[in-house]
Swiss-Prot record:
This is Cysteine desulfuration protein SufE. Participates in cysteine desulfuration mediated by SufS. Cysteine desulfuration mobilizes sulfur from L-cysteine to yield L-alanine and constitutes an essential step in sulfur metabolism for biosynthesis of a variety of sulfur-containing biomolecules. Functions as a sulfur acceptor for SufS, by mediating the direct transfer of the sulfur atom from the S-sulfanylcysteine of SufS, an intermediate product of cysteine desulfuration process. The lineage of its organism: Bacteria, Pseudomonadati, Pseudomonadota, Gammaproteobacteria, Enterobacterales. The keyword Cytoplasm applies. One of its GO terms (cellular component) is cytoplasm. Pathway: Cofactor biosynthesis; iron-sulfur cluster biosynthesis. It is found in: Cytoplasm. Its main location: cytoplasm. The keyword Transferase does not apply. Homodimer. Interacts with SufS. The active site is at 51 (cysteine persulfide intermediate).
Length: 138
C-alpha cells in the first residue's frame, strides 16, 4: 500500500483536522495516494454494486496469505473512503477481514454521521463486497 498511514495514524490525523472541510480534504488526499488500478481490472467482476459512482475493488492473496486490496472510483470522496477501508484492512488475511468490524473505527472518526446517505450506502456496499469476497477466500 503506497504511502498510506496505518490505522492509528489515520485516526490521529483525522482527529487533528479542525473541521469537516479539512476532514473531507484529507479523505480525498488519501484516495489520491492509492496506486493506479490497471485498466483491465475495471471490469464487471470487480465492480461494486450499491454505489452511485463507479467503484472497482480487486482483492488478491499474496504468497504469505495476506489480502492485497486495490481499487478505483470516478468520485474523489468515494476513492478516499475506499482508501480508509483499505487502511483498516491492511495486512490482514481473508479470515481476519471477515471477522474485523470496521464500524467502531468509523465511530471513532465520527465518519458515518457526516456522510450523505448515498455515500454511507456506498461505503457499506464496499465493506460488504470486500467481506463477502474474503469469505470465499478464507
Amino acid at each position: 500500500m503506497a504511502a498510506l498511514p496505518d490505522k492509528e495514524k489515520l485516526l490521529r490525523n483525522f482527529t487533528r483536522c479542525a473541521n469537516w472541510e479539512e476532514k473531507y480534504l484529507y479523505i480525498i488526499e488519501l484516495g489520491q495516494r492509492l496506486a493506479e488500478l490497471n485498466p483491465q481490472d475495471r471490469n464487471p467482476q470487480n465492480t461494486i454494486h450499491g454505489c452511485q459512482s463507479q467503484v472497482w475493488i480487486v482483492m488478491r492473496r499474496n504468497a504469505n496469505g495476506i489480502i492485497e486490496l486495490q481499487g478505483d472510483s470516478d468520485a474523489a470522496i468515494v476513492k478516499g473512503l475506499m482508501a480508509v477501508v483499505f487502511i483498516l484492512y491492511h495486512q490482514m488475511t481473508a479470515q481476519d477481514i471477515v471477522h474485523f468490524d470496521v464500524r467502531p473505527w468509523f465511530e471513532k472518526m465520527a465518519l458515518t454521521q457526516h456522510l450523505t446517505p448515498s455515500r454511507s450506502q456506498g461505503l457499506e456496499a464496499m465493506i460488504r463486497a470486500i467481506r463477502a469476497k474474503a469469505a470465499t477466500l478464507s
